Structure formats: C-alpha cells, structure tokens
C-alpha cells in the first residue's frame, strides 16, 4: 500500500519526498538536507515510540518525531521504522516548519502519516521560500553548474543566494547538492547498478565516497538500504 503499510522493506520516491519503511538496526550520527518525519508502525495500544539523540546528547522520544534540516542526530534502533524525507522547498514542508522549529520535535499528530497526505503538497512549491531560491535548488542537481552559475540563472549574486538558503531553509546549497547526488545514486541502485556503478552515476568519486556521504547524511550505508531499493523485492518504486 502507498502509505507504507505491509511487510518488507520499501522505498518510495515522489515529487518533494521520499518514504522508507524497514528495520533500523542502528544508525550513525548524521544530518540531512530535508525534514524527517519518523514513527514506528503498529498497534495503537500501546503506541510504539521512536527515539532520537541530538548532537548535544539530548534524547527525544515520542510517538512521532520531526527532525529539521541539518540537525545532527542519531535514531535509536527499532524493529520497523516509517520515515519520510520532505524536501524543504515543497509546500508540505511548510506544515513542518512552523511548529517544529530548528531542532527535533515530538509530534504525535504525524504518527500514521500516509503517502496520499504528502503527495499533493509535496509536488507544490513552498509559499515561504523565495521563488529564486526554489529555482536554484531545482537547478542544483546539475553538478556542472557552479554556485555562481546558479546565482546568475536566478538573478542573484552568489552571496545573496547563499544567504537566502541559510535564512529560509537552514542549509547551504552545497549540502542540498550532495542530497540530490544521493538520490541519483539511489535511483541507480534501484535500477540494478552495483554500488560502485551507482556511486559514479550519482557523481561521487568512488564507492567509498558514496558510502561516507550516505552515512553522513542518512546514518545508513548503501548495504543497509539495498533490500528496500532492489526491484526484486517488489517494494521499491517511484510514485506516480
């Protein structure tokens, strides 16, 4: 089902979001260029909890957690986790940005979030992000274009573009570029490429570079998410 229900690891990539459901044996301390909504599926009585430890060592525990972009944290192991990564420049991110703040928020109202709730707003641009910044982020997937070129495309100076990204999204565009490279590499893995091939297709120097960046930004390794990415599982897909 599209909301992450069912059995077996799965990964869904849609416009403005990605959805992963699967086991989380362990994760490394990391920070990603997206909002994260995380909860454990299961019976409502008792409600299963998820726990994340932030960069200061503070533990946050609740029925669902919202992690803002670029917040250093580590998710504690859980038998099964549903996690959404929400692009910070899409309209759905506006619902997370206002109450959440720049940290980790216990947000039980998001437990049981369904993909069909995310999809319409995920495909729409945020009303709170400057259209020029949104355009630059869309173009940032082209690694051949330097920051100065991105800025020129949208009519801004490089300094102003950097400032907008920090002010409105809380992250540098360089981190967003890495995030997009990871998405490209994940697409390649899903299509059947080896990790080494996916690394090159994603724009990384080699497989080790790909693995380091994935662990740095998701807390996981390519090997850990491979079961959810392989089409043989019948679970990985692109949303339509």
Where are these regions (language model features)?
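Alpha-helical bundle regulatory/interaction domains
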Residues: 1-160, 172, 190, 194-208, ...
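Alpha-helical DNA-contacting segments of helix-turn-helix folds
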Residues: 164-189, 213, 217-230
């Amino acid at each position: 089902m599209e909301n992450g229900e069912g059995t077996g690891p799965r990964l869904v990539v849609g416009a403005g979001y990605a959805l992963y459901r699967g086991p989380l044996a362990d994760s490394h301390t990391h920070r990603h260029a997206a909002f994260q909504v995380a909860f454990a599926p299961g019976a409502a009585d008792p409600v299963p909890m998820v726990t994340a430890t932030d960069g200061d060592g503070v533990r946050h525990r609740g029925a669902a957690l919202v992690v803002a972009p670029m917040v250093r944290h580590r998710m504690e192991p859980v038998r099964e986790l549903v996690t959404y990564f929400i692009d910070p420049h899409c309209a759905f991110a506006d619902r997370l940005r206002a109450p959440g703040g720049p940290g980790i928020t216990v947000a039980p109202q998001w437990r049981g979030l369904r993909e069909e709730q995310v999809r319409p707003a995920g495909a729409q641009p945020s009303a709170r992000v400057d259209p020029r910044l949104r355009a630059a982020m869309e173009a940032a997937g082209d690694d051949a274009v330097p920051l100065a070129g991105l800025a020129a495309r949208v009519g801004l100076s490089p300094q102003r573009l950097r400032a907008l990204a920090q002010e409105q999204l809380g992250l540098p565009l360089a981190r967003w570029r890495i995030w997009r490279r990871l998405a490209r590499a994940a697409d390649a893995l899903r299509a059947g490429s080896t990790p080494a091939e996916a690394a090159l297709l994603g724009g990384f120097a080699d497989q080790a570079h790909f693995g380091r960046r994935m662990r740095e930004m998701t807390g996981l390794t390519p090997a850990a998410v491979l079961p959810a990415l392989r089409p043989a599982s019948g679970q990985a897909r692109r949303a339509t």
